[in-house]
Amino acid sequence: MKNIGRKSNMTDKQIKFFKELEIIQEQAVSMNISQSNLTKEELLFNVSYDTVVLMMELLDGYRNMVLELSDKESREILNKDIQLHDGVVDFLKSF
């Protein structure tokens, strides 16, 4: 675990993945920064909601990578035959 955060010890794909997460974080904040009419709690729900949706889009292949999300124990691929970014809207709160 001591390699975490050291780009020199990461593969190109790992760096690309973390760069996508960096972009997602920036986008989620930018999408919500001007919502001054919301309470702090509502704003936090929105930022976290948008972050998760954007991450699900990454897993769904709508960004610069094609990834699989799998359960290690059963090896079930969780993003097979489903759009995670569509499914998440039924579970998370947004204002």
Residue ranges and their predicted role:
Residues 1-38, 69-73, 94:
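N-terminal low-complexity, intrinsically disordered segments
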Residues 11-12, 43, 85:
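Generic detection of intrinsically disordered/low-complexity segments and helix-coil linkers/edges
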Residues 32, 51-66:
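Long, hydrophobic, amphipathic alpha-helical segments used as structural scaffolds
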Residues 35-54:
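Mature extracytoplasmic domains of secretory-pathway proteins
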Residues 59-95:
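Amphipathic alpha-helical binding modules
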